[in-house]
Amino acid sequence: MTDNKALKILQEFLDISEPTLEQAIEVFTPLTVGEYDDIHIAALLTHIRTRGETFADVAGAARAFLNAGHPFPITGKGLMDTAGTGGDGANTINVTTGASLVASAGGVKMVKHGNRSVSSKSGSADVLEALGIPLNLDPDRAVRQLEASNFTFLFAPAYNPAVAHVQPVRKGLGISTLFNTMGPLLSPGRPEFQIMGIANPEQGQLIAEVFKDLGRTRALVVHGAGTDEIAVHGTTQVWELRDGTISHYELTPEDLGISHHELADLAGGNGEENAKALRAVFAGTGEPAHHDAIAATAGAMFYLNGTTDSIHEGVTHADQLIKNGTVAAWLKKHEEANYGSADRA
């Protein structure tokens, strides 16, 4: 039952038309520790949806849940995370997950935060499991995995258990809420670099501002022609955060040095089917659209952490790593690895 103190905080927030960041943190903090009844959680989420999400709402909720979460033992400098909001209905192969493996093979330190499928046939965890990448590692083993391979996967529920308090309400409401964009913002690695795909381009500037507030040095927020990915089928809108400044621009497949493909060419299946498609790309026998989509997103990763000076150069670098066998060799070395507590040579 919601106590009087929490109810007072909620009531005051609902009466404010333009809350401050501090007020948003204050109203979401009781939610992180289960102090609101479901009906009061629903009131909060529907109020924000009706009023319209503000920077304070999103940043305040993110800060409250990060404060309640469990950070990864290694945080910050040099780390990257990448994920999308989902919800675009495209059901493509796991482009971002495949690209993150290419980036790791090329030296990017990837702390990928994700979950199993929610809005698609295959979530990042589903395809990684099918590829043989170890999941469900405790923090110490995950650190060893990162040190050995430049990649680790962090299951969202293990690091942000407080989100469970809102899940029954989200499911019951059946409508999009602020929490549809929250997942990628709660990265346990508190990374220096982050790429986030968004299904709704109207949120681009806002999300970039939230990344600035959360301390990201560089970030890319992308929306690709109706999808939460860099598009090979049309124009991608990009909001780039770099050293405190946010810029907005557009990219076409031609800008990236890749061919134009149809969105249908990226249609995916379940985790096993998508893993097969990724393996084919890494082996040099994949569908051209799959190859180009993965290279495009990996190219953005190489640009973001400074490996290359432009996304176009990053795409070329990713293409070379795939074609010369570096990525396939990386996967063969690190799939099914144990990362146990015993000393390794």
From Swiss-Prot:
The reaction(s) this protein catalyses: N-(5-phospho-beta-D-ribosyl)anthranilate + diphosphate = 5-phospho-alpha-D-ribose 1-diphosphate + anthranilate
GO biological process: L-tryptophan biosynthetic process
Protein name (Swiss-Prot/TrEMBL): Anthranilate phosphoribosyltransferase
Family (UniProt): Belongs to the anthranilate phosphoribosyltransferase family.
Organism: Corynebacterium aurimucosum (strain ATCC 700975 / DSM 44827 / CIP 107346 / CN-1) (Corynebacterium nigricans)
GO cellular component terms attached to this protein's record: cytosol
Pathway where this protein functions: Amino-acid biosynthesis; L-tryptophan biosynthesis; L-tryptophan from chorismate: step 2/5
Residue ranges the record marks as coiled coil: none
InterPro entries with a match to the protein in the record: Anthranilate_Pribosyl_Tfrase, Glycosyl_Trfase_fam3, Glycosyl_Trfase_fam3_N_dom, Glycosyl_Trfase_fam3_N_dom_sf, Nuc_phospho_transferase
Residues reported in the UniProt entry to bind anthranilate 1: 84, 115
NCBIfam families tied to this protein: trpD
Binding residue positions for Mg(2+) 2: 228-229
GO MF term (any one): anthranilate phosphoribosyltransferase activity
Binding site for anthranilate 2: 170
